[in-house]
Curated annotation (Swiss-Prot):
A lipid is attached at C107 (S-farnesyl cysteine). Implicated in the pheromone A- and alpha-factor response pathway. The beta and gamma chains of the putative yeast mating response pathway G protein play a positive role in initiation of the mating response. It comes from Saccharomyces cerevisiae (strain ATCC 204508 / S288c) (Baker's yeast). GO terms for biological process: G protein-coupled receptor signaling pathway; pheromone-dependent signal transduction involved in conjugation with cellular fusion; regulation of pheromone-dependent signal transduction involved in conjugation with cellular fusion. It is found in: Membrane. One of its GO terms (cellular component) is plasma membrane. Its main location: membrane. PANTHER family: GUANINE NUCLEOTIDE-BINDING PROTEIN SUBUNIT GAMMA. Belongs to the G protein gamma family. It is a lipid-anchor. The modification Cysteine methyl ester is found at C107. This is Guanine nucleotide-binding protein subunit gamma. Keywords: Lipoprotein, Membrane, Methylation, Palmitate, Pheromone response, Prenylation, Transducer. A lipid is attached at C106 (S-palmitoyl cysteine).
Amino acid sequence: MTSVQNSPRLQQPQEQQQQQQQLSLKIKQLKLKRINELNNKLRKELSRERITASNACLTIINYTSNTKDYTLPELWGYPVAGSNHFIEGLKNAQKNSQMSNSNSVCCTLM
């Protein structure tokens, strides 16, 4: 009888040990999941196109030196009377979109 009485007591530590192992596995799975998510996030960030600060500055300088801004008449002069460069830019953009047959463009940025 003592062996029968001892068997439930032996089962409890075994069950507790199994529960501890299951809990340990769940924790390890969660850690692995978090590491994989972070790894994927870092891969996406690494695949993003990057330019150096000097190239970005050169692009800005090139744009500002080649694009006329009539809000600075001391630098660029005044626009020709009767001309509207906003409408001209819109017409050019529409012509370009018709030539390329691209209907995916919804807006024109100036």
